[in-house]
Structure formats: C-alpha cells, structure tokens
Amino acid sequence: MSRIFIDVREPYEFATGHFKGAINIPPSQLLAGAKKLNDTPKDTEIILYCLSGSRSNSSMNILRQMGYTNLVNGINKSQVKAKYGVE
C-alpha cells in the first residue's frame, strides 16, 4: 500500500521546502483541495504535517469526516523525516 504525504502549511511555507512528492493542501482549502485525492482509496495511508502539528491535526479530523481511515498526524517535517525516512 502506498503513502501520501500532505503538507498542510500555506503555499508560501510549502515553497520554502517540502518532501518530494508531497501534496500541498492548506486547511483553508482542504475541502476544495481534496479533489486531489479523488482517486485515492479511503484506506490509503495519509501522513499530514505542518510546522507544529496543530494544522495537521485539524486537517486529519476533516479528512476523517470525509471517510479516510488511515490517517497519521506526522506533526512536522523533522518528525516525519525521522519516522518515514523521506527527503
């Protein structure tokens, strides 16, 4: 099963650096931006991250309400990098 990394920081933050292949969907755009996930099975592992974990946590709750079941609040880039070995 594949993983999807969603960087929920604002676009200007995303532009300063993000994981290769990460999708940028800020919380304010999550409902509209979730179209990027249309073909994604609801049980795909989705790791969300931001700067401190607050935005990724609220975004995780929204995605859960949309039916996604395998969600991880990765907190921030450093913790995601340490746990998943992504660059």
Give the ranges of each region predicted by the language model.
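Rhodanese-like catalytic fold shared by cysteine-dependent sulfurtransferases
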Residues: 2-4, 8-47, 51-87
